[in-house]
């Protein structure tokens, strides 16, 4: 049984099939090389390397650390696996004993540990499928309230399922536009996490099809959407509260320029 294999000394993995050949969009290469200079070659090599597989275990369920896993340096419950398992056949996966998540997304833990020291009301604004929400549920101090929102209804069902499997009762799942939340819940949240929809440059290695969806126009659209989301939700943040802004992309329009906007 894979549940046994993952968390015991004998680990059985699928063959390595996650090395890809990357064909990057020309405009992306031109823009990113201008931004990174000589370091672009390192990025290009990294995007064609094996896709690391990482999981975050659920401390509430007493899940042991995988004996074949290397720890993620910035996440106490995060581990890299040597190769990818067929998680859909693992009952522990369906029971919420662990969550499959890219290690970079687990860096949220450092922000929470640095700035959240007492119970808070926290909003995960763009929460589906639930990686950051399940992480927040494990990290926030006892007595906190977590509200996980997903504006796309079909994705909100997936979010609700993952939250239920994770097993924290102090989490509410909602399906609202940021503007609705900002108007209805003024100054309610101590912490708002905004992992905003983006052009997905950070997804190139994981999903080769995403390169075909990338364009300069989409970068501009996503940058504008990110600012709209921040504008609409700002009223829900308490004065002096914490806003965590993140994307899975590299360009300055969606990252640094939107930070300047904030």
Q: What name fits each language-model region?
A:
Residues 1-262:
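S-adenosylmethionine
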């Amino acid at each position: 049984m894979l549940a046994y294999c993952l968390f015991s000394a004998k680990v059985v993995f699928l063959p390595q099939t996650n090395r890809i050949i990357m064909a990057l969009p020309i405009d992306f290469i031109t823009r990113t090389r201008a931004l990174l200079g000589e370091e672009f070659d390192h990025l290009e090599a990294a995007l064609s390397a094996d896709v690391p597989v990482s999981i975050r275990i659920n401390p509430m369920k007493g899940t042991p650390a995988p004996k074949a896993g290397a720890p993620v340096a910035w996440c106490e419950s995060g581990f890299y696996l040597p190769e990818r398992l067929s998680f859909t056949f693992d009952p522990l996966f369906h029971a919420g004993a662990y969550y499959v998540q890219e290690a970079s997304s687990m860096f949220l833990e450092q922000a929470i540990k640095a700035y959240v020291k007492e119970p808070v009301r926290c909003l995960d604004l763009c929460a589906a499928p639930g990686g950051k929400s399940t992480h927040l549920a494990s990290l926030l101090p006892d007595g906190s309230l977590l509200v996980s929102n997903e504006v796309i209804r079909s994705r909100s069902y997936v979010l609700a399922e993952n939250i239920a499997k994770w097993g924290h009762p102090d989490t509410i799942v909602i399906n609202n536009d940021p503007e609705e939340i900002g108007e209805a819940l003024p100054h309610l949240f101590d912490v708002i996490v905004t992992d905003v929809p983006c052009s997905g440059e950070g997804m190139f290695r994981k999903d080769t099809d995403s390169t075909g969806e990338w364009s300069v126009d989409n970068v501009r659209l996503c940058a504008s959407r990110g600012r709209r989301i921040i504008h609409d939700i700002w009223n829900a943040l308490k004065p002096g509260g914490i806003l965590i802004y993140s994307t899975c992309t590299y360009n300055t329009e969606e990252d640094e320029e939107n930070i300047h906007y904030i």
